[in-house]
């Protein structure tokens, strides 16, 4: 989340690759959702898809709908000539096609709904993966076979994206398309399957070392990589996903991870709680508001404070109360691996693995 804010210059720091925060989130999301579904199937020999989708709706819909209403109101007041067009874009957002309208060139505008592109990919993943996983598990397909299939999908997506680059496809097509970004989600799914098997204790030190290498690799890319450079589109995005998966795997599999103190640091966890709303509202403030006459050169920081204030208000006054309804659609198994709870606050705006937000 913070990486995305920096990339959008709401936090005035210089990180060329801040946009990779979305990739980190995709991997983590695939890992957490798959882990939850696997635990439920192990405990009950079934997966309640109705409960899954009810919980997702209760988690995502309140802030999402309020944001879209605010976007329409601001558009009507600031740009009434664009209101009819904005209604159409909001309609695409409601059916989670924002990423495709940008990928296929239906409308490239960076309007208030543009930020929903990543949520659209996430929702498309929700629609396909849980039923498919339930079907595979019900048919007694071995974990190892599912893992191999996931690995092949990751490779296929990487090849597909590289082919598009070679053939001169537009960057928007490769960046926003579900078919070109799904590798990160499925790397997360693959990590969840791997995490079902406990590694020998003697491998923990190696795992920590590999996690450290992954952190170094990610920090380097986030600091230096170019959005328009060929590296990301010719395998780089997949390497980012694999490094993120390795980091998540190492933290999840080690009870004494060197990252644990950082990931359990309360300010990070608090930002994790409000990160979904913050991800939405920062974009609306960035595109449609200015505090320059009040804050001067501190305009970006003023927007950041305003975004955090709105996001926190949304979470505590609306989302948290509606989240209480989730108990009616509870999982019949423990929520998630304890160590995985540490991972979210740094990157994930949409999936909250805490007791309250799963």
Regions inferred by a protein language model and the residue ranges of each:
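Short, intrinsically disordered terminal tails adjacent to the first/last structured region
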Residues: 328-358
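Hydrophobic membrane-embedded alpha-helices
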Residues: 2-40, 44-114, 121-332, 336
